[in-house]
UniProtKB/Swiss-Prot annotation:
Protein's membrane topology: Multi-pass membrane protein
Protein's UniProt name: Divalent metal cation transporter MntH
Family membership: Belongs to the NRAMP family.
Pfam families: Nramp
Gene Ontology BP, a term: iron ion transmembrane transport
Length: 461
């Protein structure tokens, strides 16, 4: 009887532990035991006794990694095409897209801090496996589309500065994985430092080019006012959606919800509220900086190309060759090439992290970062190499714009789950989005979906 009682007690103990482990947290089906980016999760300490400024600065960084996606080479192509063809008109789209991005990225930080999950983990928990697999596949397609833009942009940058043929440049881009691995080994702050430094170089390059272009600032200001022609003109809508896809990018939503968790966030509601405040401030400032860069590209195209009748400039190489005679200074195209190369390098860093978050979150599959990077890059290199070999520079611009439209079409499949999760009190607890924020987020989600339906109808028509 004694042994029977011991066995029963052991079984009951094991059963109780299993029930405790299976007990969902808030409205989640599983406990959030899987860590996002486990190798760097909570690796940056935040001292509770530090000053408010120091605690805020501890959250400085992730927003700039997110901002990289808002000024990648694909964005350059759409902004150049929009500025050269329609002047300053599409500045309004860049502004509205940036406001949408600020709202959505704040929701990413909210989801991560409140639930301890990134967006991919949240989708795996909330949806049946077939639905989660579809969302995973769409997220991977978005990352590959992003990577195609980065491959082409980096290859063109290498060609413009060093004269390396595009075909060889496409292959060289596969080597960037070693730089990323080295920096991650040093610590996540080193990754952020590289990205922020290159962003500074990009800003200086465009500041000089804008000073040389001398745009009509009155027209620039008017360009930030939306017009109905953006929706009624199919060509303008196509480029507008390209700008939207290049600005509010699906992979960035997964990325931000993961890298915010590199900070050591306390367990109390007060600590989480403070973390959310600082993380939102970080991403908002970074995205305003990204808007300045995006607007600079479009303004440069409008002031140099559209003004002189060059209304069909979509290829980055063509823009590079036209800048010197139009701006009257030999260094102008070099600055353009340097900024493009910096954007390409930065984008590869963030796409690698996003790919890691998506695969681990949806599939619970942990690949070595170098292997994950090479798989994604190998898939992206095939179409990029094919276009550069058979069509040369003339085809790369169109492929870049196409990748951004593909990203725009994928966007709703990341935005709707994000808005649903952050509006759900059962999942978010006291950190659920307030009603006004949820209303704005739902409006953004519906607008994005409606614009994509309009684009598809125009194509089918």
């Amino acid at each position: 009887m004694f042994f029977m009682r011991m066995i029963c007690n052991c079984i009951n103990s094991i059963s109780m532990k299993a029930q405790k482990m299976d007990k969902p947290v808030f409205g989640w089906r599983r406990n959030g035991d899987d860590l996002s980016l486990s190798d760097v999760h909570s690796s940056i300490r935040i001292k509770p006794d530090a000053s408010t400024f120091r605690r805020a600065m501890a959250f400085f960084g992730p927003g700039y990694l997110v901002a990289v996606g808002y000024m990648d080479p694909g964005n350059w192509a759409t902004s150049l095409a929009g500025g050269s063809k329609f002047g300053y008109t599409l500045l309004a789209v860049a502004l509205v897209s940036n406001i949408m991005a600020i709202v959505l990225q704040s929701l990413c930080a909210r989801l991560a801090i409140a639930s301890g999950r990134d967006l991919a983990q949240a989708c795996r928990d909330a949806y049946p496996k077939p639905v989660a697999m579809v969302l995973w596949l769409l997220a991977e397609i978005a990352i590959i589309a992003t990577d195609i833009a980065e491959v082409i942009g980096t290859a063109i940058g290498l060609n413009l500065i060093f004269g390396i043929p595009l075909e060889l440049g496409v292959l060289i881009t596969a080597l960037d994985v070693f730089l990323i691995l080295y920096l991650q080994k040093l610590g996540f702050r080193w990754v952020e430092a590289l990205v922020i430094t290159l962003l500074g170089v990009i800003a200086v390059c465009f500041a000089i080019q804008l000073a040389l272009a001398d745009p009509d600032w009155g027209q620039v200001i008017l360009g930030f006012a939306p017009t109905t022609e953006i929706v009624t003109n199919p060509d303008m809508l196509y480029l507008a959606l390209g700008i939207l896809g290049a600005t509010v990018m699906p992979h960035n939503l997964y990325l931000h919800s993961g890298i915010v968790q590199t900070r050591e966030i306390g367990p109390t509601i007060a600590e989480k509220r403070e973390a959310l405040k600082f993380a939102t401030l970080d991403s908002t400032i970074a995205l305003m900086f990204a808007l300045l860069i995006n607007a600079s590209i479009l303004i440069l195209a409008a002031a140099t190309f559209n003004k002189t009748g060059q209304t069909n400039v979509a290829e980055l190489g063509e823009a590079h060759s036209l800048l010197a005679p139009l701006l009257g200074l030999a260094i102008a195209p070099t600055l353009f090439g340097v900024a493009l190369l910096c954007c390409g390098i930065n984008s590869t860093v963030t796409a690698t992290l996003a790919g890691q978050i998506v695969m681990e979150g949806f599939l619970k599959m942990r690949l070595a970062p170098w292997l994950r990077r090479l798989i994604t890059r190998a898939i992206a290199i095939v179409p990029a190499a094919g276009v550069t070999i058979f069509y040369g520079d003339s085809g790369t611009g169109q492929l870049l714009i196409l990748t951004q439209v593909v990203l725009s079409l994928q966007l709703s499949f990341a935005v709707f789950p994000l808005v649903m999760f952050t509006s759900d009190k059962a999942k978010m607890g006291e950190l659920r989005s307030p009603l006004w924020l949820s209303a704005i987020a739902w409006l953004i989600a519906v607008v994005i979906a409606a614009l994509n339906v309009k684009l598809l109808m125009d194509f089918m028509g």
